[in-house]
Amino acid sequence: MWSTVLVLALSVICEPVRIGLVVLMLNRRRPLLHLLTFLCGGYTMAGGVAMVTLVVLGATPLAGHFSVAEVQIGTGLIALLIAFALTTNVIGKHVRRATHARVGDDGGRVLRESVPPSGAHKLAVRARCFLQGDSLYVAGVSGLGAALPSANYMGAMAAILASGATPATQALAVVTFNVVAFTVAEVPLVSYLAAPRKTRAFMAALQSWLRSRSRRDAALLVAAGGCLMLTLGLSNL
């Protein structure tokens, strides 16, 4: 269980969205307070969802029907599938085809007509405007959003549930996952006290570096994690 929790938590650290939000908090008028509020929101969401998930699913027959090894193998296969999708860009190609409509003019030529902005685009614009606010409410909501259950998160919860450990051990595993996953915000919170400018510069450089990585770089990292999870799962069967 612990190896699965740590591997999945480490894979969350460098999420571009999470790092971008941390950089955003560091550039507020009160960066320490914003970062602390961001962390509180993240801990609240992640811890609350974890406890509800473990209590609800732990009371069902499903809890005893799978092992940690099976969770590791399943997580590894999903990671490899995601890596394949990133490499082939299947989703991106589908989205590009959907954003343009093919129509013909009087001469029979095929023209490309842009589709009006979708609801998702409008929602993204509103979210961007919301994040520009300087209220602590924005920091708290950002933390809640950053900690919304992801595939890594649910994989860790499944491993914790399948372990059959005591409630205290499961709670400790949840806390460990959250602390490791939010390292990207915890370290800047501490380092800002000693070197605010260097902290801002380092986080901005990290964000720029991640943005410069190609889709295949991300696919390679995801595939490596998937292979590691498969190896752990097969060795524990």
From Swiss-Prot:
Residue ranges of the TM segments: 5-25, 38-58, 66-86, 141-161, 171-191, 217-237
High-level lineage: Bacteria, Bacillati, Actinomycetota, Actinomycetes, Mycobacteriales
Family per similarity comment: Belongs to the peptidoglycolipid addressing protein (GAP) (TC 2.A.116) family.
Function comment: Required for the transport across the inner membrane of sulfolipid-1 (SL-1), which is a major cell wall lipid of pathogenic mycobacteria. Could also transport SL1278 (2-palmitoyl-3-(C43)-phthioceranyl-alpha, alpha'-D-trehalose-2'-sulfate), which is the precursor of SL-1. May potentiate SL-1 levels and confer specificity for sulfolipids over structurally similar glycolipids.
Domain of life: Bacteria
Localisation: Cell inner membrane
UniProt keyword terms in alphabetical order: Cell inner membrane, Cell membrane, Cell wall biogenesis/degradation, Lipid transport, Membrane, Transmembrane, Transmembrane helix, Transport
Effect of inactivating the gene: Accumulates the precursor SL1278. Can produce SL-1, albeit at reduced levels.
Membrane topology: Multi-pass membrane protein
GO BP annotations, alphabetical order: cell wall organization; lipid transport
Protein name, per record: Sulfolipid-1 exporter Sap
Pfam families named among the record's database cross-references: SfLAP
A GO CC term assigned to this protein in UniProt: plasma membrane
